[in-house]
């Protein structure tokens, strides 16, 4: 089938033209508060010992860091190049944004359910969340610009001028994630009993928060969403399988303990798409208009929808893996 027929079938233009809102300024602020609470909940389970584990157990942790910060964005870029005209520029940039975000907030919970290495999972979450202040804007800027250069040379869609306001992204992530992270760790240190009681309920709440965010985003664009559901589903499915494969393939190639393989698979396959949504809704980062005139970011529906659907699908795939691993009950391979 010709590429033009496929892209027409999946209706990418209507996807990019979706006008997505979160109920105005109030909705956007509520989104920020929701993610802040989620990050506070994650921090309740983080202890200084988790950072010490990076030194004590370097092989598994360094593998996880490389998978998430280096391999996932790089291989996402190669996947986008391989897809060519099947992806619109905004959809491609949405995939890059998701890959640039740190690990998802439910990864620790799913790792525990799948009988993975919970200590490794928490250590990776702690490290990747702490450094995402720098890695998220750097990865998005680097791979986003490389993609736009490639797309411009190959006449792929209507291309935006990608300007990455590093300071605005840095500031947003510090406020939304950095401050709650520090407060949560302080609470866990000084009030351990309270932190222990709040930890799991807040983890479960995070799932509800992400589902609610996606429902709000899709509710006002339901018909347009139905028109492109097949396209969205396939793109996110393939991208998520790539992420899961990076984690499992890398850890298997290095012959890590099987519990660690499960953990790295989940950590790489579950991304904090909620952070991506908040960045997309920030008019200082992605302005819809300048001086009364619409910008290219006024048509970033493809980015928003791909990022939002990731927030649903990675939970489905994560719990599916956890169920299969628990049911299979596979033992760790005997180490040399």
State the predicted function of each range:
Residues 1-336:
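Alpha-helical transmembrane segments of multi-pass small-molecule/ion transporters
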């Amino acid at each position: 089938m010709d590429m033009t027929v496929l892209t027409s079938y999946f209706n990418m233009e209507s996807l990019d033209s979706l006008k997505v809102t979160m109920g105005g300024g109030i909705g956007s602020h509520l989104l920020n508060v929701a993610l802040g609470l989620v990050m506070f909940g994650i921090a309740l389970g983080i202890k200084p010992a988790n950072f010490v584990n990076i030194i004590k157990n370097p092989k598994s942790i360094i593998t996880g860091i490389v998978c998430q910060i280096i391999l996932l964005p790089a291989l996402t870029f190669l996947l986008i190049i391989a897809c060519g005209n099947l992806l619109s520029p905004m959809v491609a940039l949405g995939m890059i944004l998701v890959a640039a975000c740190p690990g998802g907030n439910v990864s620790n919970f799913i790792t525990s359910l799948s009988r993975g290495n919970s200590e490794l999972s928490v250590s990776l979450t702690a490290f990747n969340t702490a450094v995402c202040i720098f890695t998220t804007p750097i990865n998005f800027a680097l791979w986003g610009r490389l993609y736009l250069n490639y797309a411009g040379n190959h006449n792929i869609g209507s291309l935006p001028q990608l300007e990455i306001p590093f300071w605005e992204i840095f500031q947003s992530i510090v406020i939304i994630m950095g401050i709650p992270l520090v407060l949560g760790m302080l609470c866990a240190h000084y009030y351990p009993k309270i932190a222990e009681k709040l930890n799991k309920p807040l983890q479960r709440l995070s799932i509800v928060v992400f589902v609610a965010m996606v429902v709000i985003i899709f509710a006002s664009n339901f018909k347009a969403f139905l028109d492109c559901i097949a396209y969205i589903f396939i793109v996110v499915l393939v991208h998520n399988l790539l992420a899961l494969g990076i984690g499992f393939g890398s850890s298997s190639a290095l012959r890590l303990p099987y519990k660690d393989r499960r953990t790295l698979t989940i950590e790489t396959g579950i991304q904090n798409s909620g952070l991506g949504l908040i960045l997309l809704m920030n008019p200082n980062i992605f302005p819809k208009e300048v001086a009364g005139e619409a910008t290219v970011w006024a048509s970033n529906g493809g980015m928003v929808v791909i990022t939002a659907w990731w927030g649903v699908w990675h939970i489905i795939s994560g719990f599916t893996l956890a169920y299969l691993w628990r049911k299979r009950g596979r033992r760790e391979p005997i180490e040399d």
